[in-house]
Amino acid sequence: CLVGSEMCIRDSTSIALKIHFPLAWAVKPTLYKQFVGGETLQDCSAAINHLMKYNVKSTLDYSAESEQTPEGIQATFEETLRSIDFAKGNTNLAYAVFKPSTITTDELLAKASEKREELTIDDVRHFREFRERFMALCQRAYDNDVRILVDAEDYCFQDAIDALTDEAMRKFNKKRAIVFATLQMYRHDRMPYLRRIYDDAVAKGYIAGVKFVRGAYMEAERARAAALDYPDPICKDKQATDENYDAAVRFTMDHLDRFEMFMGTHNEESNYKLAKLMDEKGIARDDSRVFFAQLLGMSDNISFNLAHAGYNVTKYVPYASVRDVLPYLIRRAEENTSVAGQTSRELRMLEMEMTRRKEHNPAEGR
């Protein structure tokens, strides 16, 4: 079972990290090479240039899972600033991105979002510092004219993130979308939230940036909801999630005068539906307000074929040292347990992509 193998890899890697076992020799030429752009921004140049051969832009994602200490948080914040500066004026790079939980602590995000207990004086101070870092990243993106994606997090963190993202969009998105909220459409409350974003954008005169994903923490979210006795935030089944996702995309396309959209999915049907919808609405395939996106090393046949057809496409390109990015690779394996059926599809797609490359350039297949 491939998923079982992934879980075995995850468990073995977790143990190896704890005992400081050297893993780079095994990981770097395999998983790391497939899914990671390099250790530094400069190291990603080869991946960026390779993708641009197929008219696919890159979105560099600093994926180090630093400890949530003041030093670790500051280091991640500073590296994210560098990634925004690196993207300035670079037409090969489509967006910058950051994960809010890397510039604060999980505990603070949960307390601020769930409001189950009063924030202490220290909590209030730390949240103010988090807000300052959050807004500083958005300000740097605005100053550099670089669009920035605010990644979604666990349900118990998201309310605080949504509030800051809404605030940042009102401030920085007056003329175009700079700041993008991420909506995990396996949450059944995201369509009402999308409509609130639209109403707010109309009322306050800004362009909302939205990134759509399905979501990757289904088992954990349901388990936590059951343990703490609150309503399950996840759609009842995959069909309901797909319908929610499709509804969000259509709503956004119906109101594109107030939106820019980043569609992050490896689902072939979702990509096809959006491409078809753009053509039906007479929206140019290269309209800068709409981007398709996949992860580096996954669904290349979707990415390259869309780009070849003239649509805007970007790849998330993670970067960090081998050791620091291992938790990201472990999470990829964990997330795949939620979409076990996709594994065989990815293998078929990989075979298709290898065949396509051999036909396009026989030397590349050797």
Show where each model-derived region lies.
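Positively charged, amphipathic and often flexible ligand-engagement surfaces
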Residues: 5-6, 10-366
